[in-house]
Design a protein with these regions (language model features):
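Conserved alpha-helical scaffold flanking the Walker A/P-loop in AAA+ ATPase domains
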Residues: 19-23, 69-89, 96-97, 101-109
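Helical "lid/switch" subdomain of P-loop NTPase nucleotide-binding domains
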Residues: 90, 94, 102, 125-129, ...
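Structural motif
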Residues: 32, 89-91, 120
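Glycine-/small-residue-rich active-site loops that bind phosphorylated ligands and cofactors
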Residues: 40, 64-65, 98, 219
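Conserved catalytic/switch belt of AAA+ P-loop NTPases
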Residues: 104-121
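Charged, glycine-rich active-site and insertion segments that engage polyanionic ligands
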Residues: 1-39, 43-56, 115-116, 124-276
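AAA+/P-loop NTPase substrate/partner-engagement loops
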Residues: 53-71, 129
């Protein structure tokens, strides 16, 4: 039975809409939704969860915490043992923030699922989930939106032409990030400052000026990842418009730094590896 109340459609690339509707018609027992930062993975999960009347349980890190704990997963599993009159959908977001022990605790529920119970795991990187988890889930990978879609998101804004160009470059294909930058002047200003640092690193690699940009990122992993994201965007643009043999080694160093940061590596060493 469809939900009688309006359900918001997530902002998706055109190519992702048909797969989402197909999943909504026949929701799998366990689904991983992979969406890089700025894509609407959360919106896709919520759409699937509430399109049909359901009891929805949401699992996320507790306030001021960065991980989903084993105890949270066990509490959720205990709740699933109670009687349900409608289907149950458990949204775990971000799923990659489950500790390894928490993932192992979840595994039994995936191996022996309750009737009419569905798990939606939202993650930026499915490789951070245990292989045993991944093997028991279908996967929906979201893609970046088109330039035309991105431009439409900014049509109703009062941004200057320069701000529009900057946002469309820095957040290309990532609709949630586009909206955040368009609606939050402070955030846009922060991104502009990070972009200036990224430009300095790329134009004067190994210089004192490039090294001087880094200390403000050493104690802020999230900000360091933003810097890396912008560096990747800029290098990809350079490779497309002004190809050079120097680009690939630089791209490899940036990707290595990103991987280290996402696996809780030392921020200082990861960033210095790009510049030095």
């Amino acid at each position: 039975m469809p939900n009688p109340h309006p359900v918001n459609m997530p902002i998706l690339a055109h190519r992702d809409r048909t797969p989402l509707h197909q999943l909504a018609d026949r929701l799998p027992q366990a689904l991983i939704i992979t969406a890089e930062r700025g894509l609407d993975g959360t919106g896709a999960a919520e759409y699937l969860a509430i399109l049909t009347p359901s009891e929805v349980l949401r699992l996320q890190p507790l306030e001021a915490k960065t991980t989903i704990t084993t105890e949270q997963v066990r509490t959720m599993i205990a709740m699933l043992r109670t009687h349900a009159t409608v289907r149950r959908v458990i949204v775990i977001n971000p799923a990659d923030q489950m500790s390894e022990a928490a993932q192992n605790a979840l595994l039994k529920s995936l191996e022996e699922p309750n009737v009419n119970t569905h798990f939606l795991l939202v993650t930026e990187n499915e490789q951070q989930l245990l292989a045993t988890i991944r093997s028991r889930c279908q996967v929906l990978t979201l893609h970046r939106t088109s330039q035309a879609q991105d431009e439409t998101l900014l049509d109703a804004t009062s941004l200057t032409a320069s701000e529009r160009r900057q946002i469309l470059f820095l957040a290309a294909g990532r609709p949630l990030l586009i909206r955040q930058l368009a609606r939050t002047p402070k955030l846009l200003s922060e991104y502009q400052a990070i972009a200036a640092d990224a430009k300095c690193i790329l134009t004067t690699p190994g210089s004192y000026e490039a090294l001087r940009t880094l200390p403000s990122y050493f104690t802020d992993r999230a900000k360091a990842l933003q810097l890396i994201d912008i560096l990747l965007t800029m290098v990809a643009f350079q490779m497309k418009t002004q190809p050079s043999p120097a680009h690939q080694p630089l791209l490899d160093r940036i990707i290595t730094a990103e991987t280290r940061l996402r696996h809780n590596g030392n921020v200082r060493l990861a960033l210095l590896n790009i510049v030095v």
